[in-house]
């Protein structure tokens, strides 16, 4: 995953979301694939979709992670708010989407 971090850093010009976070939203909404909901698909494609190990290393272990923010939702909110993971209760804090549930996406 370390080789992907420079690419991730440059992609922060466009916010990121993990495929696993998208899957969690799809499951909650009872959908099987992103194309089943055109609105959700459009929201997801406003961000760069990346693999979960990359976002875990960059966001979960990043310097901006502070105690009390909650569980990172595998979506960034540098330029665009938490759009996709907001559907599962995530909000923006320090450029990362968090929720207070005890589940990691």
Swiss-Prot record:
Chain residues in the propeptide: 10-69, 100-105
Cystine connections: 73-90, 77-92, 82-97
SUPFAM superfamilies in the cross-refs: Cyclotides (SSF57038)
Pfam families: Cyclotide
Cross-referenced PROSITE patterns: CYCLOTIDE, CYCLOTIDE_BRACELET
Signal peptide stretch: 1-9
Domain of life: Eukaryota
Keyword field contains Signal: yes
Cyclopeptide (Gly-Asn) crosslink residues: 70-99
PTM comment text: This is a cyclic peptide.
UniProt xrefs under InterPro entries: Cyclotide, Cyclotide_bracelet_CS, Cyclotide_sf
An individual GO BP term: defense response
Entry keyword Signal: yes
Keywords of this entry: Disulfide bond, Knottin, Plant defense, Signal
Protein role: Probably participates in a plant defense mechanism. Has cytotoxic activity, active against a human lymphoma cell line with an IC(50) of 3.2 uM.
Domain notes: The presence of a 'disulfide through disulfide knot' structurally defines this protein as a knottin.
Protein family membership: Belongs to the cyclotide family. Bracelet subfamily.
Name this protein carries in UniProt: Cyclotide vibi-E
Annotated source species: Viola biflora
Lineage summary: Eukaryota, Viridiplantae, Streptophyta, Embryophyta, Tracheophyta
């Amino acid at each position: 995953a370390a080789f992907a971090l420079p690419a991730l850093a440059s992609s922060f010009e466009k916010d990121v979301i993990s495929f696993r976070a998208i899957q969690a939203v799809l499951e909650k909404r009872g959908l099987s694939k992103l194309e089943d909901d055109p609105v959700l698909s459009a929201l997801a494609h406003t961000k760069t979709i990346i693999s979960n190990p990359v976002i875990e290393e960059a966001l979960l272990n990043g310097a901006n992670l502070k105690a009390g923010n909650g569980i990172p939702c595998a979506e960034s909110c540098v330029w665009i708010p938490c759009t996709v993971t907001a559907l599962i209760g995530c909000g923006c804090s320090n450029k990362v989407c968090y929720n207070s549930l005890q589940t990691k996406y």
